[in-house]
């Protein structure tokens, strides 16, 4: 929520475009109508082929160590991924006086229905609601059959869904909604009650992770990673390098050409990189990785610390 002054009068707003822009200054590209970074769909599609660890590494080495949370249940246990642009919302327990304030703000902004409906009703294509329900499960069931159906119809995302630090209900109905994966904390038959919105498209905490509006949500491997919007392009490139190095590394280990210790080193030798380049150019399995820039890796191999024995992340 943002607080503004207008002609001496204090105005409070939910989902304020200027606040979203102020929270994400490192994003230099196109923005959505609400101010969130509009990460290109080609990167969302590229993430489908990557694993959690491949995507996590480029973020972690840059100091983003609070982007992952794994303490969830999933609506489906079939390995499907959740990928999209984050819409964040934060809630707190019911308090009568603040409830009046929050609802007055919502009415002034043309919002109708319950606090969770405010978010679902305004979703756009490829949006993923990221919801801090303060781990409330009993009477904290943010999604059920109806809202999950509405979510799917709004977002039109074959890898769509939601992340909820709270509860859900009607899971049998939810599972029938196509192309939808939901990460949640628990199930309860009670309808949602006694909660109030405190923030909409602002900084949101999900367990041990921090999510900003417009982050790319990557749910895979049993947990959720929030990728800062301005790093997505770099993350996709870095993850692709990890992917082809793994492909090559498994081959070399199987052929006894290198040991696991050599493959797992943080910095590869020039000899290993030369063989990797040859593998990329000649092996059809590596065709999609051709044309990538490996100058940084060669620089480390030639000028880096020869005693660096640290294993790769």
Describe the residue ranges of each PLM region.
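Short, Lys/Arg-enriched N-terminal segments with co-localized hydrophobic residues
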Residues: 1-11
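A broadly tuned, weak detector of single residues within folded domains
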Residues: 4-6, 28, 144
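Short acidic, Pro/Gly- and aromatic-enriched capping/linker segments at domain boundaries
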Residues: 12-30, 42-44
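A generic hydrophobic-helix recognition signal that picks specific residues
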Residues: 27-28, 208, 221
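Feature captures the catalytic cores and cofactor-binding loops of soluble hydro-lyases/lyases
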Residues: 31, 38-41, 45-213, 226-275, ...
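Short acidic-glycine loop/turn motifs at beta-strand connectors
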Residues: 33, 220-221
């Amino acid at each position: 929520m943002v607080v503004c002054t207008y002609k001496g009068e204090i105005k409070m707003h939910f989902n304020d475009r200027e606040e979203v822009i102020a929270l994400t200054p490192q994003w230099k590209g196109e923005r959505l109508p609400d101010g969130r970074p509009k990460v290109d769909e080609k990167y969302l599609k590229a993430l489908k082929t990557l694993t959690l660890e491949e995507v996590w590494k480029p973020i972690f080495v840059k100091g983003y160590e609070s982007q992952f949370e794994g303490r969830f249940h999933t609506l489906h246990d079939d390995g499907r991924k959740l990928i999209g642009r984050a819409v964040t919302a934060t809630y707190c327990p019911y308090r009568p006086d603040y409830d009046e304030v929050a609802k007055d703000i919502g009415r002034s902004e043309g919002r109708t229905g319950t606090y969770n409906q405010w978010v679902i009703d305004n979703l756009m294509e490829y949006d993923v609601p990221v919801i801090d329900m303060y781990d409330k499960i009993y009477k904290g069931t943010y999604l059920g059959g109806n809202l999950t159906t509405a979510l799917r119809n709004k977002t039109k995302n074959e890898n769509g869904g939601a992340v909820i630090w709270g509860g859900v209900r009607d899971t049998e109905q939810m599972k029938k909604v196509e192309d939808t994966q939901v990460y949640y904390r628990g199930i309860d038959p009670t309808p949602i009650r006694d909660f109030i919105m405190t923030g909409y498209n602002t900084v949101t905490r999900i367990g041990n992770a921090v999510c900003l509006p417009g982050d790319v949500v990557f749910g895979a491997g049993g947990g959720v990673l929030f990728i800062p919007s301005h790093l997505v392009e770099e993350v996709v490139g870095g993850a692709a390098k990890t992917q082809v190095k793994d492909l090559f590394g498994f081959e070399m280990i199987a052929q006894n050409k290198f040991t696991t210790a050599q493959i797992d080193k943080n910095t590869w030798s020039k000899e290993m990189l030369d063989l990797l380049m040859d593998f990329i150019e000649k092996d059809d399995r590596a065709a999609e990785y051709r044309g990538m820039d490996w100058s940084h890796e060669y620089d480390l191999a030639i000028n880096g610390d020869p005693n660096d024995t640290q294993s790769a992340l």
